[in-house]
């Protein structure tokens, strides 16, 4: 009976040893190639030691387990050195070795001159503790950085048209026309924020039908003007709430037809405007304006919520005029249009990932009081600023802009973050005019729609790197003491560009770096892409060998080789 037990134990030990030997051979050959490429020596060194250990274990020699113990210890140290507290950095480096160690400790009593079960299983317990420790690290934040540099003190407002509003107001999507997103209010501090309690809650009641699949997105940013909040729901109903109580003062129902929805119902905000033309005691002296998912521009009285009779047709402007053929949901206004020097500038999203003949990405401006068209900027028709001639449309398939625009009233400029031409992922059919302004910041004259300048953040974008952030305006003194009117534009690439907003020239250093080539016939990529090298990149730092992914040492080794 004892002989049978020994034979079974030896069978398990030899089986384990064979698995370890196969694993070791893979690491040895792969590690040798990695070292040849200039990579880490760990995999080759560990593969050789695991191979020696496996041979001794196959011969039921306890010395094989001692070699493995050395491997485990230095692998643990190496993991801590390379991965720190990054949970997913521990998994490929240590998890497989720890699993081998777990089974090996269970077999320790059955080796020649093996150790007692009590001691062996205490090692097993330590391995289990390691697993729990690694699991605990899964909840620990990693890949985070903290910038401790001081806030620059040389900012000015020489060029700013500062938005006059009380400190506790938030009158624009980005708090002010410059998109600074900064409130000087100081009642809430890091010291008392944990004491905040809910005072009120309100529900818009705008929910998707139970039997429908479209997504409803709660993306609205309410604006606060005096004691009222103004906001829009996912399907463009507008509400005015008492800021202190949350009580609904009025609601404007747009009654958007379900079949006109895009894939996602979303409204990011509304625009508040005090007229310089309409007398104070007349309706719509103060108005709330929104663009809608069914391509309408709507203005309502801020006091009553009633449609402005002077604006368009009964408070509505048809944004489909001049667009030509489209289908419901293919176009939509999702961001609040800004007002600058008496005109309201409107952009819109387009389903630009399906066909080259998608509707135009034209940018248009309307009189903020009457709703009459003031100008249009059509990329392929730069000298035509009105409606297209009868029988024609705005240029189809051109880059659209769907995010929030920024304006500078003193410079009479609207800054438009653009996306790519249709279709998103194939660039061979685009015109040179489109290629110049896709995925770029474009500065337009607010009174005429004439392009002043453009700065491209991605050349010949075929990756849907649309600019999705609002630009922020900031003025500061350069090294010579001159005041520079600046524009800050973050991007999906994690690159942040700082530009002179008068000229569009970079203030921070921008270099062109070599980019991968395309393997798609006739769809040539740009040989270089712009990099803002003076500004810290958002997201991960440059990829290195030690940051390669994997679940086991084998696939991480292959990723390092790749």
Walk through the language-model features, giving the residues of each.
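Topology signature of small-to-medium multi-pass alpha-helical membrane proteins
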Residues: 1-152
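Repeat-blade elements of multi-bladed beta-propeller folds
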Residues: 170-174, 214-235, 262-296, 329-355, ...
């Amino acid at each position: 009976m004892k002989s049978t037990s020994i034979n079974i134990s030896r069978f398990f030990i030899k089986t384990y040893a064979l698995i370890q030997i196969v694993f070791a051979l893979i690491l040895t050959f792969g590690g040798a190639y990695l070292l040849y490429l200039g990579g880490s020596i760990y995999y080759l060194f560990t593969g050789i030691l695991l191979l020696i250990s496996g041979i001794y274990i196959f011969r039921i020699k306890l010395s094989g387990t001692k070699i493995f113990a050395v491997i485990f210890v230095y692998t643990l140290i190496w993991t801590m050195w390379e991965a720190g507290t990054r949970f997913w950095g521990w998994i490929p480096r240590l998890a497989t070795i720890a699993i081998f160690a777990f089974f090996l400790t269970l077999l320790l009593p059955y080796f020649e001159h093996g150790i007692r079960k009590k001691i062996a299983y205490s090692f097993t317990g330590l391995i289990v503790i390691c697993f729990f420790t690694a699991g605990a690290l899964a909840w620990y934040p990693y890949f985070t950085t903290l910038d401790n540099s001081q806030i620059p003190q040389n900012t000015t407002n020489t060029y700013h048209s500062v938005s006059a509003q009380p400190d506790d107001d938030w009158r624009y999507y980005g708090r002010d026309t410059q998109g600074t997103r900064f409130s000087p209010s100081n009642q809430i501090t890091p010291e008392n924020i944990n004491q905040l309690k809910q005072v009120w809650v309100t529900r818009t009641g705008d929910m998707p039908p139970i039997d429908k699949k479209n997504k409803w997105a709660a993306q609205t940013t309410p604006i606060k003007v005096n004691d009222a909040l103004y906001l829009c729901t996912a399907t463009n109903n507008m509400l005015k709430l008492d800021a202190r109580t949350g009580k609904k003062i009025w609601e404007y129902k747009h009654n958007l037809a379900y079949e006109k929805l895009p894939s996602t119902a979303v409204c990011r905000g509304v625009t508040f405007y005090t007229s310089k033309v309409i007398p104070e005691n007349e309706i719509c002296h103060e108005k709330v304006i929104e663009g809608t998912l069914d391509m309408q521009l709507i203005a309502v009285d801020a006091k009553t919520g009633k449609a402005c009779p002077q604006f368009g047709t009964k408070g509505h402007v048809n944004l489909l005029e001049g667009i030509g053929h489209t289908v419901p949901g293919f176009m939509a206004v999702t961001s609040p249009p800004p007002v600058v020097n008496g005109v309201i500038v409107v952009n819109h999203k387009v389903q630009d990932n399906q066909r080259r003949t998608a509707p135009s990405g034209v940018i248009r401006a309307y009189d903020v009081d009457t709703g009459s068209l003031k100008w249009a900027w059509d990329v392929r028709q730069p000298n035509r600023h009105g409606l297209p001639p009868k029988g024609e449309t705005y240029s189809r398939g051109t880059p659209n802009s769907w995010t929030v625009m920024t304006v500078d009233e003193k410079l009479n400029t609207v800054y438009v973050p653009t996306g790519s031409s249709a279709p998103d992922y194939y660039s061979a059919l685009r015109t040179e005019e489109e290629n110049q302004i896709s995925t770029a910041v474009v500065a337009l004259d607010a009174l005429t729609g004439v392009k002043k300048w453009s700065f491209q953040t991605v050349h010949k974008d075929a990756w849907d790197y649309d600019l999705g952030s609002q630009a922020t305006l900031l003025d500061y003194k350069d090294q010579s003491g001159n005041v520079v009117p600046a524009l800050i534009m973050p991007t999906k690439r994690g690159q942040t560009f700082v530009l002179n907003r008068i000229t569009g020239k970079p203030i921070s250093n921008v270099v062109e770096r070599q980019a991968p080539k395309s393997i798609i016939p006739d769809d040539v990529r740009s040989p270089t892409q712009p990099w803002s090298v003076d500004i810290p990149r958002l997201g991960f730092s440059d990829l290195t060998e030690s940051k390669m992914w994997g679940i086991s040492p084998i696939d991480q080794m292959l990723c390092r080789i790749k």
